[in-house]
Amino acid sequence: MDMESKKPYLMVTIIQVIYTIMFLISKAVFNGGMNTFVFVFYRQAFATIFLAPLAFFFERKSAPPLSFVTFIKIFMLSLFGVTLSLDLNGIALSYTSATLAAATTASLPAITFFLALLFGMERLKVKSIQGTAKLVGITVCMGGVIILAIYKGPLLKLPLCPHFYHGQEHPHRNNPGHVSGGSTSWLKGCVLMITSNILWGLWLVLQGRVLKVYPSKLYFTTLHCLLSSIQSFVIAIALERDISAWKLGWNLRLVAVIYCGFIVTGVAYYLQSWVIEKRGPVFLSMFTPLSLLFTLLSSAILLCEIISLGSIVGGLLLIIGLYCVLWGKSREEKNSGDDKIDLQKENDVVCNEVKVVIS
C-alpha cells in the first residue's frame, strides 16, 4: 500500500481524534450550564469566519457557478444534516454522557450503509462472502450500540476517580449524564442521539451526490457553515431570549466554541468531504468506533465518567463489526479491480483476433 492509498486512513483517524476532543469539551461546557442551541450557533458562526477567507483565496477562481437548484440542495442538507443534527445532539449530550455520544455516533456505519443502499450508492450481495461479512458487521455494530444504551453492568474502578465507589455520590449527581441507565432522561437522550445520527447519516450519503455537481469542497463546506449558522441563530433566538446566556467570557465556553467552530466544523467537515469523494460515505462512517475508544478512556480520566462492563462489551462489538465491514469492502474492491483487469484482457484478445482475421 503506497502513501497515496494510506491518506484516506490517516484522514479518518485524524477526524475521529478531533471528534473525541469535541465530545469531551462539549460535555464539559454543557455541565457548566451553557445553552446547547446558543453553543451550536456560535460554533457554526466561528466556522464560517474561519473558512470564508480560505475559500475566497484558494477556490475563488476554480469554484464552479452555483445554480439555484444546487443551492436549495445545500440549504436542505445544512438544515437537516447539520443544524437539526447538531441541536438534537447537544440536547442529548446534556442528558447523557460523552461516552454515550461517541457510542451512538458509532451507529453511523449501520445508518449510512442502509441509507447508501436506499439511494443506490452501495450494494449488498448476501450470497457472497463479502456481502455476508458486511451484513454481519453491521448487525454486530447495532448490537454493540444497543448494549451501550441499555446495559451498564459492574463498574470498572479507576483510582483516579475514587468517589464513584464505596457508596459515595458523584459530584455531578444532578447531571442527567450520570443517572441510571433505566431513567427517563437517559432513554430520552439515547433516542435524541440516534435521531441526530440518522440525520447525520443522511447528510453523509446525500452530500456525495451534491459534490458530483459542485466539486468545490472548500466552498461547499463554507456554504454549509454559513447557512447552518443562520438557521441555528433563528432556532436559538427563538428558544433563548436571555442575553446573559449568549455571553462568552475568557473561559472554557470560549475555548469550546473556537475549537468546535475552527477545528471540528471547519477542518473536520472539509476532511470528511475529501474522504467521501475519495472512498465514499460508508468508508468514512466505518471509522467512527475509534472515537468511542478514545472517548471512553479520556472521559473517565478528565470528566470522571463511569466506565462500566456494558461500555467495554459494547465497544468491543463495535470494533469487531467495524473490521468485518472493512474486510468485506476491501474484498469487494479487490474483486472489482480483478474483474476489470480480466475484462481488459478479454478485450485485448478479441482485438488481436480481429486484427488477424482482417490481415
Swiss-Prot record:
Keyword Isomerase: no
Keywords: Membrane, Repeat, Transmembrane, Transmembrane helix
The organism's place on the tree of life at top rank: Eukaryota
Molecular functions per Gene Ontology: transmembrane transporter activity
One Pfam family of this chain: EamA
GO CC field: membrane
Membrane topology: Multi-pass membrane protein
Record's keyword annotation contains Ribosomal protein: no
EamA domain sequence ranges: 18-136, 198-326
Transmembrane segment boundaries: 10-30, 37-57, 66-86, 100-120, 135-155, 186-206, 218-238, 256-276, 282-302, 306-326
Subcellular location, record wording: Membrane
Family: Belongs to the drug/metabolite transporter (DMT) superfamily. Plant drug/metabolite exporter (P-DME) (TC 2.A.7.4) family.
Name used for this protein in its record: WAT1-related protein At5g64700
